[in-house]
From Swiss-Prot:
Protein name: Metalloproteinase inhibitor 1
Similarity comment text for this entry: Belongs to the protease inhibitor I35 (TIMP) family.
Annotated S-S bridges: C24-C93, C26-C122, C36-C147, C150-C197, C155-C160, C168-C189
Organism: Papio cynocephalus
Site positions (Involved in metalloproteinase-binding): N37
Signal peptide: 1-23
Binding positions for Zn(2+) per the UniProt entry: C24
UniProt-listed GO biological process terms: cellular response to UV-A; negative regulation of catalytic activity; negative regulation of endopeptidase activity; negative regulation of membrane protein ectodomain proteolysis; positive regulation of cell population proliferation; regulation of integrin-mediated signaling pathway; response to cytokine; response to hormone
Entry PTM: The activity of TIMP1 is dependent on the presence of disulfide bonds.
Location relative to the cell: Secreted
Amino acid sequence: MAPFEPLASGILLLLWLIAPSRACTCVPPHPQTAFCNSDLVIRAKFVGTPEVNQTTLYQRYEIKMTKMYKGFQALGDAADIRFVYTPAMESVCGYFHRSHNRSEEFLIAGKLQDGLLHITTCSFVAPWNSLSLAQRRGFTKTYTVGCEECTVFPCLSIPCKLQSGTHCLWTDQLLQGSEKGFQSRHLACLPREPGLCTWQSLRTRIA
């Protein structure tokens, strides 16, 4: 593998020239879905400038992990994550970190590939301070309770109906025009009884 090098303006121009015209699009997930579908969920600071591998056209960001919420077994003996990897082009869902505040903490939910943390534009990456207190509680404690049995089911157009008793209908985008509505910021889809999951309130108190 070719070494990673600082992302220079010439490389940016090359990537722009060879990138397909169609941009990456995806539907942002409910935070619980992001947690359950990710291999690794951490809190970290972006502390370095992006570096690009000119052979694979992947870039990496240096991070400083401050907390891990999911992935202890998947990570194995590795005690720390120092880099996060993403495609170097936005057209293929590459994530571009736009904050220059190196002391700001971010919630990062991603996939592990060969022991390396990978994210895309479609991954859940958000400033920790932008999360509601309920969402913080979900990531630190509660979302995991619903991962095995429950599914957040997006409702994007009418009519939509539940396909299973273990599904919770997510209507934020339909009713409020945003994935950051009430259900996203304050609720989790959790087991009520065997074979049944319902939206349940997340207390604002952090455990």
